Regions:
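Helix-loop segments that flank and shape redox-cofactor active sites
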Residues: 55-80, 138-139
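Conserved alpha-helical segments that form or flank metal/cofactor-binding pockets of metalloenzymes
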Residues: 72-103
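Intrinsically disordered, compositionally biased, charge-dense segments
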Residues: 1-47
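A structural signal for well-ordered alpha-helices, especially hydrophobic packing surfaces
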Residues: 49, 56-63, 89, 93-96, ...
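Disorder-to-helix initiation segments
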Residues: 38-55, 113-120
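Short amphipathic alpha-helical segments with heptad-repeat character
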Residues: 46-49, 53, 79, 86, ...
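Alpha-helix N-cap/helix-initiation motif
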Residues: 41, 48, 71-74, 78, ...
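Acidic/histidine-rich alpha-helical segments that form the ligand environment
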Residues: 108-162
């Protein structure tokens, strides 16, 4: 083999290595984009989690302010929610973070005073709309199941507020 053949082979080998490296870089980039696609818009997830975290304190405020007809049943229903939601949201966020990384974009919201059981019912209906709209920000079945459990608690609370006096 002459010197030119060796040089050509060497250049071909370098080109092949560069092309493989570019392909690997593209695959890594595509995998990163796929992970983002699987995750969905994290801002929707962040908002849902922020609302759920806020709901614990908001419902506790409603609980402490209950008064009037049917207030004991409402008081106990609201207590069941704010005591139950903490562990559910904590588990949901930890599961999400184990797969996708830390949630860091939390929002805070103003608190409302207790006005009536009807206002509490309206609050839970609005919260459910947010959960329903934002839950598709994650596709994983185990995260969807955890969101189902949150909605289960929400609807159980709504039942108690509407029908138990």
């Amino acid at each position: 083999m002459n010197k030119k053949d060796l040089s050509d082979r060497f250049l071909d080998e370098i080109k092949r290595n560069l092309m493989e490296q570019e392909e690997d870089d593209e695959e890594d980039e595509n995998e990163s984009e796929e992970t983002q696609d699987e995750k969905g818009g994290s801002s929707d997830f962040d908002e849902m989690i922020s609302r759920l975290l806020h709901s614990q304190t908001q419902v506790h405020v409603f609980h402490l302010g209950t008064k009037g007809s049917g207030s004991y049943a409402a008081h106990k229903a609201l207590q069941g929610y704010y005591e139950g939601i903490d562990g559910l949201v904590d588990g949901l966020v930890e599961s999400y973070q184990g797969r996708y990384g830390l949630v860091t974009n939390y929002d805070s919201y103003e608190m409302d005073k207790f006005e009536s059981v009807e206002k509490c019912i309206s609050y839970f209906n609005d919260l459910n709309k947010i959960i329903t709209e934002k839950r598709d920000s994650v596709k994983d079945s185990y995260l969807q199941n955890q969101i189902d459990t949150v909605q289960e608690l929400l609807f159980s609370t709504l039942y108690k507020l509407k029908f138990l006096k």
